[in-house]
Amino acid sequence: MSISSKIRPTPRKPSRMATDHSFKMKNFYADPFAISSISLAIVSWVIAIGGSISSASTNESFPRFTWWGIVYQFLTICSLMLFYCFDLVDHYRIFITTSIAVAFVYNTNSATNLVYADGSKKAAASAGVILLSIINLIWILYYGGDNASPTNRWIDSFSIKGIRPSPLENSLHRARRRGNRNTTPYQNNVYNDAIRDSGYATQFDGYPQQQPSHTNYVSSTALAGFENTQPNTSEAVNLHLNTLQQHINSASNAKETNDNSNNQTNTNIGNTFDTDFSNGNTETTMGDTLGLYSDIGDDNFIYKAKALYPYDADDDDAYEISFEQNEILQVSDIEGRWWKARRANGETGIIPSNYVQLIDGPEEMHR
């Protein structure tokens, strides 16, 4: 066995959610929406506090509660900057939204008292609180919405870090993963229809769905870097590749005829998907790779593989399966970096090819 095969590979990239929440100013500078809106808020606050001080120093009647509103707005701006620097905005979205809503009420109340008052100094103060009210309203729209909302996706598309992960999408995706382990294909179709009817279908249109697919070629464009650079393919596999292709084509044609007679309303799956933690703008062409997620019959698991290392499935990927070291798995197509496999308990999903080793060639399909 080569030295490279003794070293356990690491096919997964670290998730964005596992970042270190230390103080970094670049977290603030990397977000154009944050730096522009907070800068405008600071300028508006300076105008409001300057006009208020000038108006109060001339013995003019000035609403006293406005002082607390101005101080509260300053604390809100400072806390928002700290949340960005520590990368904690997604963790405190509810607190941020409610605190900004309170500041919006304070500023609109102060604007009502100052806008009809006489004097240029009070006019400056009223202009400042009106600008703060507008900025607060924009903040409520942004921080009060989910990261998957159209407005948030459009705003975050200008950020260096890209679109922020959506807790709503991630929770629904993990729920699908747990449901797919213990449900029948009929129940999975009902679950997918329920998500589609609930109004969240647009959030998952880009994800590969578990629907029938009759394509047998597996493209691994989206999984570059995870390949097994030294596949341990036996000579028997190479000798039977041509025969295997003929068997797969005949089995695929038979399955397609059967599926068409049972269901005439099946639709095709889209050719692109967005990864959970991508910037949402990069479209990865999957093509026939979606065949990995289809329901393949027993006759297509024609290889056997032995697990070289234990593997824990990623909770954010509903299609990966876990397995133990030295476990024997049944594998279908072996042309991609990720193979579709089935465990002894019937659990089916995808596994990284560099975690397993083929131990058996293709079996006779009509034995």
Curated annotation (Swiss-Prot):
Belongs to the SHO1 family. Residues 259-272 have a biased composition (Low complexity). It holds the Pfam family SH3_1. GO terms for cellular component: cell projection; cellular bud neck; plasma membrane. It comes from the Eukaryota. Residues 253-276 are annotated as: Disordered. Residues 300-361 form the SH3 domain. Residues 54-65, 115-122 are extracellular. It is found in: Cell membrane; Bud; Bud neck; Cell projection. InterPro entries: SH3-like_dom_sf, SH3_domain, Sho1_SH3. This is High osmolarity signaling protein SHO1. The modification Phosphoserine is found at residue 166. GO terms for biological process: regulation of actin filament polymerization. It is a multi-pass membrane protein. Plasma membrane osmosensor that activates the high osmolarity glycerol (HOG) MAPK signaling pathway in response to high osmolarity. Detects changes in external osmolarity and activates PBS2 through the stimulation of STE11 and targets PBS2 to the plasma membrane. PBS2 activation leads to changes in glycerol production that helps to balance the intracellular and external osmotic pressures. Activates also HOG1 in response to heat stress and mediates resistance to oxidative stress. Involved in the regulation of the mating pathway. May be a receptor that feeds into the pseudohyphal growth pathway. Glycans are attached at residue 59. PROSITE patterns: SH3. Forms homooligomers. Interacts (via the SH3 domain) with PBS2. Interacts with FUS1, STE11, STE50 and RNA polymerase II. Keywords: Cell membrane, Cell projection, Glycoprotein, Membrane, Phosphoprotein, SH3 domain, Stress response, Transmembrane, Transmembrane helix. SMART domains: SH3. The keyword Cell membrane applies. The chain crosses the membrane at residues 33-53, 66-86, 94-114, 123-143. Residues 1-32, 87-93, 144-367 are cytoplasmic.
